[in-house]
Amino acid sequence: HEAVAEQRVHAGQEHVVRALTNALDSGRVHHAFLFTGTRGVGKTTIARIFAKSLNCERGTSAEPCGECNSCRDIDAGRFIDLLEIDAASNTGVDDVRELIDNAQYMPSRGRVKVYLIDEVHMLSKSAFNALLKTLEEPPGHVKFLLATTDPQKLPVTVLSRCLQFNLRRLEPGQIAAQMTKILAAEQIGAEAEAIALLARAADGSLRIEEGRRDPADD
């Protein structure tokens, strides 16, 4: 559901999309980005779309085609030059050292090697130190996309080397609209009143509501 995912991002995070679009259009893309915000506001979705923008076979663009092999492989989670690490489950320095050791090598397929580290604040202190060394002298072919729900726990040395984007909590109306689109795409009927109730209870996060919708309830 890439179209739905991208609609979800654009619905509440236009300020982030606009800044990233300007960077891509100008050809001046920073080496490290930090996306902050609560769960379910589109942090990793934006990061994956950005990875496609950098590696689309039709050229670097704010609007990747979504159809070439690179775009399809990124969507499917099998693009060799997009490395995703969930710091919540990989906090050891060995994982990050391995990641950093590989950063020096040129991309295998794409133009840019992209590292997406989710919940980056959960890395250990030694892991942060290993990451910091690469952020201080980043290879030109590498981009770091860091995401966190708790930026206060990040070392200042890491924060200072990243462009930061705070993703806003979604308004109930935005959540309801996106839920309606998702349900329609999956051909699932739902009452507008029920959607509105869930949207108000979501507290700004769409992911939670996607998780609550159980097909067994249909």
Positions of predicted regions on the chain:
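P-loop/Walker A NTP-binding region and its immediately flanking N-terminal helices
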Residues: 1-164
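A general alpha-helix detector
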Residues: 6, 161, 178, 193-197, ...
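Short, surface-exposed acidic/glycine-rich loop or hinge patches that mediate macromolecular interfaces
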Residues: 40, 90, 149, 169-170, ...
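Conserved AAA+ ATPase "SRH/arginine-finger" region at the nucleotide-binding site
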Residues: 86-88, 164-175, 188, 200
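Conserved AAA+ ATPase "sensor/coupling" helix adjacent to the nucleotide-binding pocket
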Residues: 99-103, 118, 161, 165, ...
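A short helix-loop-helix "switch/interaction" segment in the helical subdomain of ASCE P-loop NTPases
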Residues: 184, 193-207
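Conserved C-terminal helix/linker of AAA+ ATPases
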Residues: 210-218
